[in-house]
């Protein structure tokens, strides 16, 4: 009986946590990554501020959890698997540009908010740096594959190529091209893919 009761309590806690994270995500999307307070998140989730703080000690810990939550919602693992399982390194480059084009509209508001929070929150800064490093490692894996297949541009060091791939496909580049310069999603994908192939590969 006690186990059943504890399970119900756990289920309620998980449900409340999910509602809080979904509320935070929705508010960030509505405000394009603008400032969102814990009180506003509580109101959006239909819970008290106290309930929010029971699950998340502060705004930094909430946003660290939110990053993981959004990754799960957008199927990040499937996105990464598509890139890794591409038939060639060149196909992986194209898949990466396509993935950035498709997922960045949802990621950008959270990235914008996280970048502001990380400057004053140690946990958020650590999560941010880990994320950057993970993405760079993925870029380097693609470049190594290009080199192994003989597709990497002659004379281009692997480390330099990885840095270029990491930078060209960064969310900041996407922001500049799509949000600032008003390029369409299809244009971003097409032109970024072409730049990557011309800069990184020996393909004519």
Show the residue positions of the predicted features.
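Amphipathic alpha-helical packing segments from all-alpha helical-bundle domains
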Residues: 102-113, 123-149, 159-163, 194-201
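Hydrophobic alpha-helical connector segments
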Residues: 65, 78-106, 162
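N-terminal intrinsically disordered/low-complexity leader segments
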Residues: 1-15
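Helix-turn-helix
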Residues: 19, 27-61, 65
């Amino acid at each position: 009986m006690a186990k059943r009761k504890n399970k119900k309590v756990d289920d309620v806690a998980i449900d409340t946590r999910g509602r809080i994270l979904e509320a935070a995500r929705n508010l960030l999307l509505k405000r394009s990554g603008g400032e969102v307070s814990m009180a506003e998140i509580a109101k959006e989730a239909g819970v008290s501020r106290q309930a929010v703080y029971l699950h998340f000690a502060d705004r930094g810990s909430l946003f660290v959890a939110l990053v993981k939550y959004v990754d799960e919602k957008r199927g990040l693992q499937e996105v990464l698997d598509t890139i890794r399982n591409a038939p060639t390194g060149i196909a992986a480059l194209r898949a990466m540009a396509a993935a950035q084009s498709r997922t960045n509209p949802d990621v950008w508001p959270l990235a914008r908010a996280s970048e502001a929070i990380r400057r004053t929150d140690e946990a958020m800064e650590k999560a941010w740096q880990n994320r950057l490093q993970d993405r760079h490692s993925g870029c380097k894996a693609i470049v190594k594959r290009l080199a192994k297949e003989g597709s990497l541009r002659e004379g281009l060091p692997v480390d330099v190529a990885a840095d270029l791939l990491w930078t060209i496909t960064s969310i900041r580049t996407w922001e500049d091209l799509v949000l600032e310069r008003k390029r369409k999603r299809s244009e971003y994908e097409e032109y970024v893919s072409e730049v990557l192939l011309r800069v990184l590969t020996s393909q004519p």
